[in-house]
Structure formats: C-alpha cells, structure tokens
C-alpha cells in the first residue's frame, strides 16, 4: 500500500505557479461550489492543468480566493475556490 503524502494548499498553489511558469502541467482535484446557487459537493478531477492570469476583483467577485486555470484536455478556462482544492499531483492538500 502506498503511503499518502500531504501538502499545504498554499504550498501546492505556489508549486502550480512554478510549474505553469515554465510551461508545464499538473493534475489536481477540487470540490465544486457555486455561491450564487448554493450548490456543490461534486468533485472535479483535472488531469492536465496550467494556471492562467487571475481576473481582477472588480470583474469577478472574490477573485483573490479563486484559482484560475486552463483545463488543457478541454482547452477551457476555469476557476475554483482555493480552499476547496483536494489534491495536487497525487498529494492530499491540507489547510
């Protein structure tokens, strides 16, 4: 049985940025949540991602708390709440 490794969420985000800065890609998962509808709970697994530039707060509310990325398999820009990130490159994320 493989031993589970852990990483702090904000350390994972810094590592995502480092990987993205050199054109690399990473895998991660997060819990979906929509503040407007109050719905969520589904887990999204992104197998090939790269961070993209953050949208300013005046365009997207609370953007400082979101992770902006491109899903490379779907070639779509997406975002998620940073604190809802579950895994990064096989490591479990903790707060």
Segments the model singles out, each with a brief description of its role:
Residues 61-95:
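Short, compact, well-ordered microdomains
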Residues 32-74:
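Short, conserved turn/kink motifs that form compact alpha/beta structural patches or helix kinks used as
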Residues 16-20, 36:
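Short secondary-structure boundary/capping segments within folded domains
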Residues 21-22, 62:
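Short, 15-30-residue, compositionally biased linear elements
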Residues 1-17, 44-56:
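Charged, amphipathic alpha-helical segments
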Residues 22-30:
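A short, Trp-centered hydrophobic/proline-enriched beta-strand micro-motif
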């Amino acid at each position: 049985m493989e031993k589970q490794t852990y990483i702090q969420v904000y350390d994972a985000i810094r590592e995502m940025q480092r990987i993205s800065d050199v054109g690399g890609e990473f895998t991660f998962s997060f819990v979906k949540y929509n503040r407007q509808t109050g719905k969520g709970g589904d887990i999204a697994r992104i197998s090939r991602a790269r961070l993209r530039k953050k949208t300013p707060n005046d365009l997207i509310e609370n953007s400082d708390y979101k992770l902006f990325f491109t899903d490379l398999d779907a070639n779509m820009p997406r975002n998620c709440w940073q604190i809802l990130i579950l895994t990064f490159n096989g490591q479990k994320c903790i707060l």
